[in-house]
């Protein structure tokens, strides 16, 4: 027997549709507001406060944490895996690291370090990349692998190689960030993308050794080569032994 569609059924179905539409609309509005959020004013105020206080106060720490939550919310929209991984990390503000972010294994947990002076100066996309960069270092076990490689290779070469590996997976990088194309141009190499840390370290060490050999062969006119070597060592992370693996995305490179 054919069921007669009652008015109550129509109203109920229409209510379900409206509820779903409202939920979708609310979700869309939330995402839109998140993308419209401009962190620069808030970050600028915190930087002014940092300059005035000369140290990290509870108020500054709370403000930076709020911005970090916003940044992770943006990461959640595009890469939920990275966002959830970020939530599992300890977080600590430090002003004694040379990069916006750094990471280390401490007390049985991974810790993400934030240099507020540098991190707060970054655009939103670079903030996202800085966090994802550190997570990739952790996932690829770069800390333990680097300790082994540094027994055979120069520390700055290994650091360049680590950054080349992780930056393969990141987008919207500045032209002179430590990427495979950048290193190819810098060293006149033909490195392939998405290769191992050991591959990049080996190739970069050979190029670096050649530069040093060129320097030794130019006793009187070696200023240019000296500058080249100095620039290379300055581009890589600082060798800090057991200290954090640092993210080399310089705030000035925009």
Language-model features and meaning:
Residues 1-129, 135-254:
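Short, functionally important secondary-structure microenvironments
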């Amino acid at each position: 027997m054919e069921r007669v569609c009652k008015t109550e059924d129509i109203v109920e179905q229409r209510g379900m549709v409206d509820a779903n539409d409202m939920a979708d609309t609310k979700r869309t509005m939330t995402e839109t507001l998140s993308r419209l959020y401009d962190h620069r004013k808030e970050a600028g105020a915190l930087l002014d406060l940092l300059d005035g206080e000369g140290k990290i106060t509870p108020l500054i720490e709370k403000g930076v944490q709020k911005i970090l939550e916003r940044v992770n919310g943006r990461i959640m929209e595009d890469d939920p895996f990275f966002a959830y991984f970020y939530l599992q990390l300890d977080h600590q503000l430090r002003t004694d690291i040379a990069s916006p972010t750094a990471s280390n294994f401490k007390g049985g947990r991974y810790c993400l370090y934030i240099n507020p002076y540098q991190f707060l100066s970054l655009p939103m996309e670079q903030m996202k990349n800085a966090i994802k960069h550190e997570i990739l270092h952790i996932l690829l076990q770069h800390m333990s692998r680097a300790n082994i490689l540094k027994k055979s290779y120069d520390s700055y070469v290994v650091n360049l190689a680590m950054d080349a590996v992780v930056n393969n997976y990141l987008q919207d990088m500045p032209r002179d960030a430590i990427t495979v194309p950048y290193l190819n141009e810098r060293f006149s190499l033909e490195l392939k993308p998405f290769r191992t840390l050991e591959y990049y370290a080996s190739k970069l060490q050979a190029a670096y050794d050649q530069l040093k050999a060129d320097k030794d062969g130019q006793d009187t006119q070696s200023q240019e080569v000296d500058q080249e070597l100095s620039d290379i060592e300055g581009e890589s992370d600082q060798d800090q032994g057991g200290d954090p693996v640092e993210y080399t995305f310089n705030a000035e490179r925009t």
